[in-house]
Amino acid sequence: MDRLLTLSLRYRFFTLVAIVMVVAAGLWSFAHLAIDAVPDLTPVQVQVLTRAPALGPVEVEEFVTFPIEASLNGLPALRELRSVSRYGLSAVTAIFDDSTDIYRARQLVAERLARAVERIPTEYGRPIMGPLTTGLGEVYQFTLKGPGYSPMALRTLLEWDIGMKLRAVPGVVEVNIWGGEPQQFHVIVDPAKLLSLKLSLKQIFDALQRNNALAGGGYIEHRREQLLIRGEALATRVSDLARIVVAHGSGGVPIYIADVAEVREASALRIGAATAMGDGETVIGMVQMLAGENAQRVVTQVKERVLEIQQTLPPGVVIKPYYDRTLFVSKVIRTVRNNLLEGGLLVIAVLFLFLGNLRAGLIVASAIPLSMLIAFTGMMQAGLSGNLMSLGAIDFGLLVDGSVVMVDNILRRLSASKNRQPEERLAQVLAAGREVLRPMTFAVGIIILVYLPILTLTGIEGKMFRPMAATVIMALAGSLLLAVTVTPLLSFWFAGTGGGHEETRLIRIMRGLYAPCLRWALARPMWPVAIAVGLFLLSLGLGARLGIEFVPRLDEGDLAVQVWRLPSVSLSEIGRAHV
């Protein structure tokens, strides 16, 4: 540290260049730093989803969930397997150690899924991995409204147009759709007609599969041109399905699907519904953010894309957002920014009152933004996000401790010196810095040691508090580095030329109050000890009555209402009880 102090004063130009580089790196890191409201507590996990519309919960667990769990069991770094088996859906969650890279975890799961597919009958669904997102990935939600449009038309528009365009936004990993009616073509067979024509249900299935497909036949050359041969037999309308030939009757007369069944456009069997604003059922879209992305930037781009999509929608169809993560993030960041700004101004005011030197106060205060920029650079390199925990824990009083000691001692040495030559000033600044270098380093180092045990926390506690400790440690380390290099240099340039290190009026008042108290305490040493012990015991009693919370409560400004009903309640009943 002594050599660093000497070099910073000897090579002042290079020190100035280093300051500029630190500022540039800090500003760039701050501009690209992931900003969110709170730390992401989601563990490293991969979700495997399987849709099995024909199965109930018991069958889903037996034929789908169990084979997937058996295939995933024993994966490297696997910590826990969880599963939920519901009507028509299996969700298996594989949780890995926090040190596991999420992409490696997904690769391991993908390799084992090939084994699981072999154990699950084809008609029971095919397992797929869920989107690469976290618990904080739900960043933007909206409803799609259009007077005169059916729920089926709105869902189709959201699924095949709006959703696909939103998935193309950088940082968006998935767009989930709730509500509406999924479009299907239903073939409702008449058993009596089947019997009269001596047909089976299997013949109907086979006819639909054979005649609802594409086929390629290569190409032919005709008049110097190459013409592709294709068999286009995909059904796009109800009439296409109705005219599929099932078999041939007597005399070779074709028997069509329409002869034995009713073909119509209808909704798929629904297992859920969505309502909004008390206006009945609607269609809802939820944008999910890619894990590790900047919520502020992603949502901003999503809103820009929504404005573009709105211009292309059919007349009367409107996208109405009802949840926007940036509103909450902006409130949190605004609170943190105001607290930091007010704290910085308060520190500058206190420094001026105690030092009695505006230049000295500004020199000390310069350590605050520079330390923050160093912390931003470290956070960017460590992959930490700026949030209420990581930024709100920074104490400006701690950041200026070293600089206060350094500046005060430099002012004392300069005021005692009668020589105003640059060489003598440089020598006095160097000597003053060396006098306080060791105790200043120990003082800041001890504070850093207090935060080191927090870095050993694991699980949810670690995800919550490790970013806070890491940010504070980086800011304190940066403040110590600045106190050794930048503060002496600024003091050499701007601290004045001797004199002016007299006690301020505030210091004299405080000294007048403190001196009698000190004499009284030294004359009666047992009384201060007894008072301290009494206050300690009183604090223990008061502390036992305080409430305990894992994290502070955050008011996002939104209400989450959960309504519990009997498991057997019908979907139509839930729809009538919408709020």
Q: Model-flagged regions — what are they?
A:
Residues A349-F354, M372-L388, T441-W493, G541:
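Hydrophobic, glycine/alanine-rich multi-pass transmembrane helices and their short helix-loop junctions
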Residues A577-V579:
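Conserved small/polar residues in nucleotide/adenosyl-binding loops
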Residues M1-G344, F354, G386, K463:
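Membrane-proximal extracytoplasmic
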Residues S8, D395-A416, M440, L482, ...:
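Short helical (or helix-break) motifs at transmembrane helix termini and adjacent helical loops
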Residues Y322, I333, V407, R413-F442, ...:
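Helix-loop junctions and hydrophobic alpha-helical segments within the transmembrane domains
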Residues M1-I35, R434-V436, E502-P552:
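Signature of alpha-helical transmembrane segments and their immediate interfacial
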Residues S8, V48, L72, V109, ...:
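Residue-level signature of catalytic and energy-coupling elements of molecular machines
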Residues G26-A31, Q47, L345-R412, T456, ...:
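Hydrophobic transmembrane alpha-helices and their membrane-interface caps
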